[in-house]
């Protein structure tokens, strides 16, 4: 998309179309970019929590919206599994405080299983 062209969400076909229009399609990529540029000045491990609107590039299907909110919790710079455990605990605590009951967390990591 060139400057001056209007972004048409109905015709956006891929992530590049959204990026060209200034719309975030993901919260993780900007975080990794920030960390790679500033990692030397950040605590190690670096913990981040982000909640914000993002947009889908594909045509939304029933029950899926073009715009939705994404919640990311990330720990960067910690090579051990302790970071993974901390993220799982944070997720279960948050879901519990939001009133969700009976949810199940599935681990799909062959080194753990």
Residue spans for each PLM region:
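TRNA-recognition modules of translation machinery and tRNA-sensing kinases, especially anticodon-binding
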Residues: 1-113
């Amino acid at each position: 998309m060139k400057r001056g062209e209007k972004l048409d969400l109905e015709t956006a076909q891929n992530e590049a179309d959204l990026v060209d229009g200034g719309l975030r399609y993901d919260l993780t990529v900007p975080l990794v970019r920030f960390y790679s540029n500033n990692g030397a000045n950040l605590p190690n491990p670096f913990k981040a929590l982000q909640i914000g609107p993002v947009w889908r590039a594909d045509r939304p299907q029933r029950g899926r919206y073009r715009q939705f909110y994404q919640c990311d919790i990330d720990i960067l710079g910690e090579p051990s599994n302790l970071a993974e455990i901390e993220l799982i605990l944070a997720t279960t605590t948050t879901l519990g405080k939001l009133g969700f009951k009976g949810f199940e967390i599935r681990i799909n990591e062959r080194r753990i299983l």
